[in-house]
Amino acid sequence: MQQAARAAAALPPRAHCLLACGSPAPLATRLQTCWGVTAPPRARRLSTAEGRGLEAGASCDDPTRVRTNVFKAAIRPSPEQRRQIGLWTGLRSTMVAEMISHVSGLDWFVIDMEHGPNELGDVLLQLQASQRGRAEPVVRVPWNEPVAVKRVLDLGAQSIIFPWVNTAAEAQQAVEATRYPGLGGVRGVMSLARMNNYGAANPGYYQEAAEQICNIVQIETVKAVENIEEIAAVDGVDALFIGPSDLSASMGHIGKPQHPEVKACIAEAFKRIAATGKASGFLTANHDDCKWALTLGCNFVAVGSDMQMLTAATKAAAADFHAYCQML
């Protein structure tokens, strides 16, 4: 023991860092021991809501609280509402999700499981990349089916689009998939998952989860349009989202979402949704139609998709430079 102590005393001062690094002492203490410096105070990370410049209901970093869904509150109709601008995504890319959420300036974006190639693991990675950013990730599930919804919710998704909802009964089925038994639903209970911080001191999750889940049902057929008031009356439905492509097909104008009859139907649908007090959503790559929808009172719009924008920009660049090269 005495020989070991003498050997340690003979070490150069900085070499004691190797001994201190194995110590269970706090990092600040080890820095002082090794290098004679004082660690700076640890900065507090902002919650998602604070990062958006909005009032924070609960920090993302607090494992005892359910993450506040700022998007759910932001789409609620009101005279002061700031319309929410978003984008559809189907490239199955965590980098796209991160870019949109952190630097694009958009308010929301869709991770599409119905028509996109996203599987459950892809959704998880995109949620992890985006949920601390500004834009809310909204997952469109492949179908209005409780198992698919349960698995997405367990990953931590809080905003869900349900495709092909035609009746109040189907809207009720969608809502029940997001709520636990005894609280109006059939959602399966999982105690250790991402949605409740892996069970970390969050006993209120099961009671509070539904308050922060945003349920968006898609209106994509003539039948759904006929049932707008009944669908909107279902408790737990937060928004009705008009899908112009499927709606035009349902009306006999497949591939022609700008047909006058289709646009007249959509305009009437916006008016009726507004009368119910629920939010309305819309998707189109045509920016004039996006502005038209906003003028009609639409509360949140997707102004295109990642694939569509990449394709259009690539084709435009190729045409521009091929034309330029012909002039050389």
Spans of features found by a protein language model:
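N-terminal chloroplast transit peptides
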Residues: 1-30, 34
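Expand to "…catalyze enediolate/carbanion chemistry for C-C bond making/breaking, isomerization
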Residues: 8, 18, 40-328
